Amino acid sequence: MDFDAIVIGGGHAGIEAALAISRLNFKTLMITQNLDTIGKLSCNPAIGGLAKGNMVREIDALGGEMGRIIDFSMIQFRVLNKSRGPAVQAPRAQADKLMYQTKAKETLERQDNLDLFQDTVVDFLLNSMRNEIEGVVTERGNKFRSSVVVLTTGTFLRGKIFIGEYRANMGRLAEFSAYGLDKTLLGLGFEMGRLKTGTPARIHRKSVDFSKTEVQFGDSDIIPFSFSNGKLDKSQLSCYVTYTNKRTHEIISENMHLSPLYSGEIVGNGPRYCPSIEDKIVKFKDKDRHQIFIEPEGFNTEEMYLNGLSSSLPENVQQKLINSIEGLEHAVITRPGYAVEYDYINPIELYPSLESKRVKGLFIAGQTNGSSGYEEAAAQGLMAGINAALRLQNKKPMILTRTSSYIGVLIDDLVTKGTKEPYRMFTSRAEHRLNLRHDTSDKRLIKIGYDLGLVDEERYSKYLFKKRRVEEIKELLKQRRLSLKDIADEQLKKHVNKDFYHILKDPSISLDNLIKIDPSLSDSKVILEQVELDIKYEGYINRQKDLIKKLHNLELVKLPFDFNYGIIEGLSREAREKFSKVQPATLAQASRIPGIRNTDITVLFIYFSNPKNKVVLNFSV
């Protein structure tokens, strides 16, 4: 059977890729090993967090689905880093895992131009030169032809789980690994490796003594992840906090030899910023305790997730260490924690469009690229899907820059630097994070989604109204001046005869203070919050914009693909090797490759500025 596009895998990357391509009117097939596990939250029952929440809102602004699914399935909402500046604040929501999964599958099933099929892809159909995709072959011998394929294997490509001495070829507990494509990819010359991740035990709610824990409530004022949603009124469940102690650490230390992580059996690098409890005890010996979050997995389940207690120790040891923790003395394990090791492709093998350099029409996204996390996977899946569709239309790829989005930072880091460990997004990875606030995701990206055809007229009109209203209120603030009769607050005295716009730049004055004086300035919380943040941080934002303009000149110089950098005189040997391997898309990307000197960039700039050599403007966003 023939399709325009095939998506391999039904995880968070696969969902976004399949929806994007089919919504752009291409006949799409998603093939996954188990249709009942589409959109499964394999590890923590939460979406969002620092930088991750920003990415979810960016996905939504571009026309992706993750924001709408979590808005539907959330059971608790919190804004993280509330006490800090807006650049590092981020929304995070606990999810009802089953509800999230069900909604994801339902969305796919109802989507026009999209078919779902349960099978395991074991090989590619390629042209005679073996450098262009023509389809896939499945475990049961089915052949499906297509012009593009998006590969999203998650932890399933030669996945292997570890619990003490127990080993099994699985990508998740009780779910079999995928084999076949690993040999195909190696045969095509892809640079591959092994990575490791892990998950903690789940326990029964009734076995927890919550009186010995700290309660963590959600925020009463919920900010929707999706810009298409208005005010959300949700029932919320509490999370709870407890801590490991000296006895917990002793149990782990006494049994460290039983951990496959330290016995040498696991060769893949684990996530640096989400270590197992064994790793924490070894690497942070000075710490007397580690924080553990007890998180509900849904409204209709008694299972609780022990965030911060990931482990691959034997089950009896896991039981002992859990029972040593206050509040968990009688905790009953329903599912053990485990480590999982899996194959990944070094993302340096990809163009910024996420298309493979070795095989035309093959796009790769998610954990297959060495990233970690649902949000990172979904972001890549969306961009891979968009660019696969643009390839089918014979159009230039859509490349988001580092200055436009966290998604741009994520992909640029992966394809420019590669990775040897699971890559996780942080606000600190973005040079211009004040410009990437979660509340401005629509301002930065929704027009792109609209122009592509992924954002409908209704959503775009709603955004234009918001944009117009923000500007109107700013103008009103510039026109309104503070008079003596307005002053009811001592803090305002020093601002007499100043306009409200400049008064609002004072950190001690809030927009609420000014609305009390002039109620006509009042509007929805979303609009007022954006007005206030835009004005208060205007100076910083303008300085960042000046820097971005200077960097933009480097982004504009597009470098040719498959170029022989050995012919350019003046480049260092290291630069020639790295440019040839990475094949940077722009001069800016070339400058970010580790080990590249400014002199190498100057040589490139002079070479491609020569009229004899081709210089193309890159319409990155």
Curated annotation (Swiss-Prot):
Record keywords? Cytoplasm, FAD, Flavoprotein, NAD, tRNA processing
Q: Which cofactor does it need?
A: FAD
Which InterPro entries does the protein's record reference? FAD/NAD-bd_sf, GIDA_C_N, MnmG, MnmG-rel, MnmG-rel_CS, MnmG_C, MnmG_C_subdom, MnmG_C_subdom_sf
Q: Does the keyword Repressor apply?
A: no
- One GO CC term, this protein: cytosol
* Residues where FAD binds: G9, G10, G11, H12, A13, G14
- Where is this gene product found? Cytoplasm
Q: Which GO terms describe its molecular function?
A: flavin adenine dinucleotide binding
Under Gene3D superfamilies, the record lists: FAD/NAD(P)-binding domain, GidA associated domain, C-terminal subdomain, tRNA uridine 5-carboxymethylaminomethyl modification enzyme MnmG/GidA
Detail which positions bind NAD(+). Answer: 270-284
Tell me the GO BP annotations in alphabetical order.
tRNA methylation; tRNA wobble uridine modification
Family (UniProt): Belongs to the MnmG family.
Task: Describe its partners and assembly state.
Answer: Homodimer. Heterotetramer of two MnmE and two MnmG subunits.
Which HAMAP family does the annotation name? Answer: MnmG_GidA
Summarizing the function annotation, the protein's role is: NAD-binding protein involved in the addition of a carboxymethylaminomethyl (cmnm) group at the wobble position (U34) of certain tRNAs, forming tRNA-cmnm(5)s(2)U34.
Q: What is the name listed in the Swiss-Prot or TrEMBL entry for this protein?
A: tRNA uridine 5-carboxymethylaminomethyl modification enzyme MnmG
